[in-house]
Regions:
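SDR active-site strand-loop-helix element
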Residues: 29-30, 76-83, 122-124
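Catalytic Tyr-X3-Lys loop
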Residues: 24, 32, 39-58, 77, ...
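C-terminal helical subdomain
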Residues: 114-123, 141-182
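Active-site loop of short-chain dehydrogenase/reductase
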Residues: 22-23, 37, 68-81, 114-117
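A glycine-rich helix->loop->beta "capping" turn
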Residues: 15-26, 34
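The beta1-alpha1 cofactor-binding region of Rossmann-like NAD(H)/NADP(H)-dependent oxidoreductases
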Residues: 1-11, 43
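Catalytic loop of short-chain dehydrogenase/reductase
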Residues: 75-100, 106, 110-113
Length: 182
């Protein structure tokens, strides 16, 4: 569903719980960004991005964590990127929302980790190899696959995080192609 529509988000959470039972795993992979300078952008972009990148995570966690606490187990994995740790040029409408998202996830991890809920933040430090990504930035259209994070590899890492033993839970996990400059 459109996670920026909070009423619809709540409705979908209730429907999933009613039809399938309480989820044990939540993957928050919603993202919206505008990449312009402060003066070229619009202040309302920050609010729109915040609603998708951060507020939707809060509503999902609020709807699903009570059942995880009751079951004494659960996994919440939030996907993000380097904007969560540093603002760069052309990200004043995006970076603050990703930083807030990471801090929210960290707060949830500290609150609910002792209750059996593993919360992790997966930072993908690369463009992801999708048709949308390749057409969004013209210089990426003809680039070799090796410069991109591959969706299957990201999914494999998410699965790995979700399967971690309680004695070795991670929170900040960074992944990137080997040629990514960092």
């Amino acid at each position: 569903c459109d996670v920026s529509n909070i009423d619809k988000l709540k409705e979908v959470c209730a429907k999933v719980k009613n039809e399938m039972g309480a989820p044990e795993v939540l993957i928050h992979n919603a993202v919206k960004g505008n990449f312009e300078t402060l003066l070229d952008g619009k202040p309302e972009w920050l609010e729109e991005n915040f609603r998708i990148n951060t507020t939707s995570l809060m509503y999902l966690a609020h709807a699903l964590i009570p059942d995880m606490v009751k079951a004494k187990k659960g996994v919440i994995i939030v996907t993000g990127n380097t904007a969560a740790k540093r603002g760069i040029a052309n990200t004043p409408y995006f970076a603050p929302t990703k930083a807030a998202q990471r801090i929210l996830a960290q707060s949830l991890a500290r609150d609910f980790g002792p209750q059996g809920i593993h919360v992790a933040y997966l930072m993908v430090d690369a463009s992801i190899n999708t048709p949308w990504t390749r057409t969004r930035i013209e210089k990426q259209i003809n680039q070799p696959d090796i410069i991109f994070a591959q969706p299957k590899d990201i999914a494999d890492e998410i699965y790995h995080i979700a399967q971690q033993a309680r004695s070795a839970w991670s929170f900040d996990v960074e992944i990137r192609p080997d040629i990514e400059q960092w």
